[in-house]
Regions:
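Surface-exposed, low-hydrophobicity beta-strand/loop segments enriched in small/polar/acidic residues
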Residues: 1-149
Length: 149
């Protein structure tokens, strides 16, 4: 009997453990990301701002892990869930991605994809200690990262 390779299809449920009233999407927001390759669980950041249209950038270095920045975790493009994409150039009045922003409401995520992307040598290349700093910054925003076994 031939062996068939198992393919891991990424799903939003591979990221989100618990969200208060997911049909309403309290913790999700349309955002703009400076165009760059994005994956499920990608952390993006921007300087804290009340301007909801201010663009986020992909986290690329530990130096960006400061409490004067706000963070979000990407879950899809401007249409829907998408595990891997490059955002289109943003235009006035339009957004190019959907992200989990926290909003002070508790949302629980699995750390697996977030940690995998954050510690990738092609990404932010965070150490375990730096990832724990990221975990603390996300938790302050209401995003809890739960250990993945």
């Amino acid at each position: 009997m031939p062996f068939t390779p198992a393919v891991l299809n990424k799903r939003l449920s591979d990221l989100i453990v618990h969200e208060i009233d997911p049909s309403v999407g309290y913790n999700r927001r349309d955002i703009n990301i400076t165009p760059a390759a994005v994956q499920l669980g990608q952390v993006v950041f921007r300087a804290k701002s009340s301007d909801l249209t201010a663009a986020y950038a992909v986290l690329s270095a530990a130096a960006q892990l400061v409490d004067t920045n706000e963070f979000a975790i990407v879950g899809g493009d401007h249409y829907s869930f998408n595990p891997s994409f490059t955002p289109r150039t943003s235009a006035t009045g339009q957004f190019n991605a959907v992200a989990i922003v926290g909003n002070g409401n508790a949302i629980q995520l699995k750390e697996y994809f977030v940690k995998q992307v954050a510690q990738d040598a092609d990404g932010a290349n965070l150490t375990d200690a730096q990832f724990e700093t990221l975990r603390g910054l996300l938790e302050a925003a209401g995003i809890q990262l739960l250990k993945t076994l």
